[in-house]
Regions:
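Hydrophobic, membrane-inserted alpha-helices
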Residues: 27-31
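Polar-ligand-bearing catalytic/cofactor-coordination segments
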Residues: 1-24, 36-37, 43-45, 50-194, ...
């Protein structure tokens, strides 16, 4: 079973970094087309500098942004003693600092991890998750989230969110500028460049979204594997995933920007079954359970 779960872990990490590199190439390509069309290299420099600034901002404030969007509130050990002690024990086993714990008042069972590194990590769970799962299942979910922290998934996931938004915004600006100012260039070369630019600007957000979804699905499978290794009881996480998937109602506060951070789609299990796998933020539950149980 262990070999079945962990064989592709290192391969998935390599592929993820390749996808991240592709994101930066998209940004540079957009800036290049725009700078070439207007004959100004400063536009490309602006794109590069602005993308770096956005990534720095996301690094320092990612946890605050995500927690604000989710409506999570920090709790004390006395308020949720069992939850706190389970996470505390797993953190010791994983060799990680104890993350801060946040709770979301929502009946939909779900959880996520955020923060810029293991020393500034946060694990958030819904009240529905706490009431639905038994201790071994809760350990499985928390082990999954700690694996995101240990695997440094949180920062990568946040950067993906920022880059998808950045590519979409710049593509929109690029498309509008080419359409409204395309008449200024009547020569054949200018028209060809405008056509290429418009096609690229329209398609790049779509490909950026696909990259975001691909990274999310790979990271979830990796965290499942690492979480099972941490608890040494993959059946606990498998049972938890099955219970979570059977809850069909969406979360009260959900944002597509952070949907991929959750252990399950916040839109609910019913919605997830109706959309195609290509646009799903998470791998199919059946696939995840099969991988865990071997």
């Amino acid at each position: 079973m262990a070999q079945n779960i962990y064989t592709n872990v290192s391969k998935n990490i390599t592929k993820t970094w390749m996808l991240m590199a592709l994101f930066f190439c998209l940004i540079i390509a957009l800036g290049y087309f725009l700078s070439l069309y207007y004959g100004s290299a400063n536009i490309l420099y602006f794109f590069v500098i602005f993308s770096i600034l956005m990534n720095l901002t996301s690094y320092w404030f990612s946890d605050k942004i995500v927690l604000a969007l989710s409506g999570a509130k920090e709790i004390k050990k006395s308020e949720y003693f069992d939850l706190y002690t389970v996470l505390e024990n797993l953190s010791i086993v994983a060799g990680l600092p104890m993350p801060r714990i946040y709770v979301i008042e929502d009946l939909a069972p779900n959880a996520f991890a955020t923060g810029r590194d293991k020393n500034h990590a946060v694990v958030a769970v819904t009240t529905g998750l706490i009431s639905l799962l038994d201790r071994s299942e809760l350990e499985g979910v928390l082990g999954h989230e700690l694996s995101h922290i240990g695997n440094r998934d949180m920062l990568l996931s946040t950067v993906v969110v920022v880059l998808v938004g950045f590519v979409s915004i710049i593509s929109d600006i690029f498309t509008r500028s080419l359409i409204f100012h395309g008449g200024d260039r009547d020569h054949k070369g200018g028209n060809v460049l405008m056509l290429i630019g418009i096609i690229f600007a329209i398609l790049s957000p779509f490909f950026a979204l696909l990259i975001q979804l691909a990274i999310s699905r790979k990271r979830e499978l990796l965290a499942d594997a690492s979480g099972a290794l941490l608890t040494r009881y993959p059946e606990g996480l498998a049972r938890a995933l099955k219970k979570i998937s059977q809850y069909s109602r969406p979360m009260i506060r959900q944002s597509s920007a952070i949907a991929h951070l959750y252990i399950a789609d916040p839109k609910g299990g019913g919605f997830g079954k109706r959309i195609t796998g290509l646009f799903a933020t998470h791998p199919p539950v059946e696939q995840r359970i099969k991988a865990l149980m071997g």
